[in-house]
Amino acid sequence: MRARALQHFLRSGGVIAYPTESCFGLGCDPTNHRALKRLLRIKGRPQRKGLIVIAQHFSQLQKLIAPVTPEQKQRMFTRWPGPHTWLVPASRRCPALLRGRHTSLAVRVTANPLAANLCRHAGMALVSTSANHNGRVPAKTARECHRLFGGRVKVLPGRTGGASKPSTIQDLITGAIVRP
């Protein structure tokens, strides 16, 4: 999918399935309310749980998160780019559907070249939640995504990064590991 077509598709509320570090992810424009509702419905994920947002560069995340100190940013980049997700206080502009019932947003600068290129071509950060029905095993291939979601999502080809487990999730403020 070409960059302009991808941008148009996402800005129009489209949902994609794409390869990430460990599995295929479902993604959409993180600022499009209709797309967020659609993704949550397709996945069967409760709104209260919140979603992860990935980016190619930190700058793609800045409008969604509250300002961070230079020390906090440095801490984040000890793990980025890579499969490490930080819980960062959300900005007032961050959609409630992204945060769920939380005051923080889960964010990651991806090391997966395909996912990073998607963010670059889309011109934005992307939602990244595992491509599965809530509570089920995530899809590892485009074929599995087609089988699970049919025509409800645009499946983009590619291979996952080969990581065997989902990204670690850590709270930036407290340092607590939420998911090892």
Swiss-Prot record:
Protein's recorded name: Threonylcarbamoyl-AMP synthase
UniProt-listed Enzyme Commission number(s): 2.7.7.87
Catalyzed reactions per annotation: L-threonine + hydrogencarbonate + ATP = L-threonylcarbamoyladenylate + diphosphate + H2O
Family the UniProt entry places it in: Belongs to the SUA5 family. TsaC subfamily.
Subcellular location: Cytoplasm
Main location: cytoplasm
CC annotations in GO: cytoplasm
Lineage: Bacteria, Pseudomonadati, Pseudomonadota, Betaproteobacteria, Nitrosomonadales
Biological processes, Gene Ontology terms: regulation of translational fidelity; tRNA threonylcarbamoyladenosine modification
Role played: Required for the formation of a threonylcarbamoyl group on adenosine at position 37 (t(6)A37) in tRNAs that read codons beginning with adenine. Catalyzes the conversion of L-threonine, HCO(3)(-)/CO(2) and ATP to give threonylcarbamoyl-AMP (TC-AMP) as the acyladenylate intermediate, with the release of diphosphate.
Domain YrdC-like: 1-180
GO molecular function: ATP binding; double-stranded RNA binding; L-threonylcarbamoyladenylate synthase; tRNA binding
InterPro entries recorded: DHBP_synth_RibB-like_a/b_dom (IPR017945), Sua5-like_dom (IPR006070), TC-AMP_synthase (IPR023535), TC-AMP_synthase_SUA5 (IPR050156)
Domain of life (superkingdom): Bacteria
Entry keyword annotation includes tRNA processing: yes
Pfam families given in the database record: Sua5_yciO_yrdC
HAMAP family for the chain: TsaC (MF_01852)
Keywords assigned: ATP-binding, Cytoplasm, Nucleotide-binding, Nucleotidyltransferase, Transferase, tRNA processing
